[in-house]
Amino acid sequence: MSAGCDFVALYNGQKIPLIGLGTWKSEPGQVKEAVKYALSVGYRHVDCAAAYSNEAEIGDAFQECVGPNKVIKREDLFVTSKLWNTKHHPEDVEPALRKTLADLKLDYLDLYLMHWPHAFERGDNLFPKNPDGTMRYDYTDYKDTWKAMEKLVEKGLAKAIGLSNFNSRQIDDVLSVATVKPAVLQVECHPYLAQNELIAHCQKRGLVVTAYSPLGSPDRMWKHPDEPVLLEEPGIKKLAEKYKKSPAQILLRWQAQRKVVTIPKSVTPARILQNLQVFDFSLTEEEMSHVGSLNKNWRYIVPMLTVNGKPVPRDAGHPNYPFNDPY
């Protein structure tokens, strides 16, 4: 079944498929085949970012599969990318998007997100660091970056724009100056970080929420030895047995029923296909609440740095760091 049938509408009428292919941590050598396979089995939503350093390979897949006389029409595909932290200066925004478009071999994006609210030093080094290993920050106001992003919509380079990793206060701050409203907020979200308040905040303001790491990001580099493993959660495994589905499919179904878009990453064909097969069953209201009640406010994705031999949150020193607020 194609995920193309199962979507939510953005405030501007665009339709975003509820399941997309995530590409963070997908190796350049593998990502082209993963995207081609995903498109062949019915995916119509691909989530990308300049900072993942694999957009050119994704572009090769698009070139083979998408466009006039190809299997998929461009207008049937939803492509997201993200503006990186080193490109927040208003003058850098359009060139950054044009580079992404050239890499992806596309004329426009369906959605362009500001990847984080905080900026790094301008330049082409994705992770500019001081000699002691800490990040070199820039203090461009994200509202100025937003105003530059609005021009991309006027120019037809992006159909919609949005935010990633912003907290509720920062979202309202952007809304206070926006002439083009953010259409989407993309954040980490899964039963251990259910984000109920943030989702309600967004839905009230007309933003659709996309969940990254919806399966708890089992392949991260920095792992805490004591962290809970979402795919091993007994309640989830029990539901998987009941519906003859995998624990991953239960997690994705839970989000789809909440009208939350998910972008599970995989380069394995069997998993790519399985992640799409969540539209042939439903969880009961009781089961939905049970999965939601597993929340522990456990954030798996906090970028870390090693400073003086100790792991520390990479961006906590920036005034716009989003994770100090309750939500």
Curated annotation (Swiss-Prot):
Q: Which GO terms describe its biological process?
A: aldehyde catabolic process; cellular detoxification of aldehyde; lipid metabolic process
Question: What SUPFAM superfamilies does this protein map onto?
Answer: NAD(P)-linked oxidoreductase
Q: Which reaction does it catalyse?
A: a primary alcohol + NADP(+) = an aldehyde + NADPH + H(+); S-nitroso-CoA + NADPH + H(+) = sulfinamide-CoA + NADP(+); S-nitrosoglutathione + NADPH + H(+) = S-(hydroxysulfenamide)glutathione + NADP(+)
Report the subcellular localization: Cytoplasm, Cytosol; Apical cell membrane
Leading EC class: oxidoreductase
Tell me the keywords, alphabetical order.
Answer: Cell membrane, Cytoplasm, Lipid metabolism, Membrane, NADP, Oxidoreductase
What EC number(s) is this enzyme filed under? 1.1.1.2, 1.6.-.-
Catalytic residues per the record? Y52
Molecular function terms, GO-annotated: aldose reductase (NADPH) activity; S-nitrosoglutathione reductase (NADPH) activity
Q: What is its main location?
A: cytoplasm
Superkingdom to which the source organism belongs: Eukaryota
Q: Kindly list the positions annotated as binding NADP(+).
A: 13-24, 47, 164-165, 213, 215, 217, 265-268, 271, 274-275
Q: Output the Gene Ontology cellular-component terms.
A: apical plasma membrane; cytosol
- Site (described: Lowers pKa of active site Tyr): K82
Q: What protein family is recorded?
A: Belongs to the aldo/keto reductase family.
Describe the function of this protein: Catalyzes the NADPH-dependent reduction of a wide variety of carbonyl-containing compounds to their corresponding alcohols. Displays enzymatic activity towards endogenous metabolites such as aromatic and aliphatic aldehydes, ketones, monosaccharides and bile acids. Acts as an aldehyde-detoxification enzyme. Also acts as an inhibitor of protein S-nitrosylation by mediating degradation of S-nitroso-coenzyme A (S-nitroso-CoA), a cofactor required to S-nitrosylate proteins. Also acts as a S-nitroso-glutathione reductase by catalyzing the NADPH-dependent reduction of S-nitrosoglutathione.
Query: Which protein are we looking at?
Result: Aldo-keto reductase family 1 member A1
The beginning of the lineage is:
Eukaryota, Metazoa, Chordata, Craniata, Vertebrata
